[in-house]
């Protein structure tokens, strides 16, 4: 008796299979980093705190573990885009898990076919908040007023919980903020990353090498498709010269959903228009470093 050969997969079925594989692979990588280095985000931001505390005091920056963590994360981001945000940040992975659980609850209990999320206009405005938050924190650190934040840090509460330690007394505000952030994660993908993450704001400002970013070959796209934007947690439609490209968290959700496979990384031909803004950012950081160094001798 002859065996019937399995029918070859259609292009749509193959894309769906590849998308599932990519999703499970990313989840595995996120779980690995969540278990192995849950405190990387807190360590990196503690480096930001140490940097501006030393600047405010007019002291030479010490090469402690927090500073080295910050330099390592920034250097990695310059070379490989925001891979840390998309795959390795424990807080971001928590947001993905809460968002996935929220979708399951909405589907099973409330029979919603489409998961609720905030309107795009609200998202685009909300993304600006993290830059204001970063500026406010920097101002507090430079002026040596960091004690005003004692007990109010939600990521410090999260760091203690991942280390299986309860927050000490006096962290009521931080616990309340963490609960509110978790609720936000249920109604918007990457809620904290988009709206409140000061490290995300810092990473978005870095002059990432253009060929490390994701790029879309727009001339090969289906007119009116927008599949990449619909899947993007930060409402970003990839363009060759997007001014919002720093908001991309390198989760690669767009790569798996593109029906024409037009989204790529490490393609020099697609990023030739991005070198000028990158060099501009690099120059600004250089001038900032020179100014900070000059201020030490005034």
Indicate residue ranges for each PLM-predicted region.
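Short alpha-helical catalytic segment bearing the HExxH-like zincin motif
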Residues: 249
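Non-ligating segments of multi-cofactor redox enzymes
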Residues: 1-230, 234, 238, 246, ...
